[in-house]
Amino acid sequence: MRHALVVAAAIAASAQYAGAQALPNCDFVFENTPVTTLTRLAQPSGLYLTILGRGVVVSCAGQSNRISADSAEFNEELGLLLLIGRVHYTEPQATIDSDRMTYHRAEDRLNARGNVVATMSSGSVMRSPETDYFRAVVGRPVSRTVAIGRPQLSLVEPGAGGGAVEPVVVLADRIVLVGDSVVYASRRVDITRTSVRANSDSAFVDSQREFVRLMLSPVVTGRGVRPFTLRGGVIDLHSRERKLERVLATPSGHVLSGDLELLADSIDLRLVDEQLQQAYAWGPGRARATSPDRDITADSIYVSTPNQRLREMHAVGDAFANSIADTATVTSNERDWISGDTIVARFDSAAAGDTTRAVPRDLTATGSARSFYQFGNPQGVRERPTVNYVRGRVITIAFADGEVSTVTVTDQASGVYLEAESLTAIPPARPGESAPQTPPRSPARPGTPH
């Protein structure tokens, strides 16, 4: 104790001798240990360079912080305290361990280097080769932690009811932590949590608001039973009670989830229990939804995916859907299609035991509806299909086993139904007989409206 008082008194006397102005926020008190060694070297300015070894303990007078290290050097003229070997800093807001540390008294900034581990009062942990810690002092009410050299932050978020949950892990070239809840990450950002992984060039995280913004080539990947991948210019993630509820990508949104691929200027995903349930696509450009054998485009598209299984699509505004013709009975370069002001498509699972692939149940086009579908002809010639083209206010196409079963037209119905001509071979003429004539082609028969 006597040794600590002697060291503190010597340094205070040096500052007074130099006629120094008011001390910065931290006035060092060297408590030290019974075996601490002390060497003081006078500088031309009249201030001293103090070297301490064999165990050092330092604190700020009247403050709840403390630093311990193997050795230290205090330059009064520069206001720098250099600590070397097993450095351990503590205060109510944070604990920092490192191989070396420099305390800049004028800024109340700690620069820690070598195996730095900074632990916040919330339990969040930053690991890096170098970290600057700006203490919360007068004029800076919130602490700031700046880590470089590809740091890793384990951000602890309180769970619902106050219980702890798995931390969010942030990896980047540079991370700034404001307080213990706001994060700015830049360059090669990788954010991982239980059900989702996000990558971007820069990111902002506010754990109190449960909000994340990803910028510059962001990608979000859902890691549940049925994963999804979302891309866009900027992606926002909103959570509630630490569960992801909404993901918004704009511009150039692109999502891929099992049966569904969705492209639009803006894409909004809604999740329940961190499983994709709904998707909205809209923007100045056209929205496009693609399932295994079908494309739908419109001004905007709504997709229902309960339990992340495709069930419905609503295409609004000059909607157009096309699909590959029935390959079992038709060989054609033409695609089947249906259009209208609005198209609603409903889907089922392929089979009771196969819920990973959706097949169409029915499509309904409303408002100036038109449709073009091809069927196998009676002769079984795949290259010459039967064609059905109809128009009406409402057109409903029902499917059986994924293939067109019936086409129903309601109001203002018109159209044509064309069968391929008979391909029956005509026998050659016998001697003395004239060749038989080709039977006349059947007249076009319009489809029967219902």
Language-model features: locations:
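Bacterial N-terminal signal peptides
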Residues: 4-15
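N-terminal amphipathic/hydrophobic interface segments
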Residues: 19-450
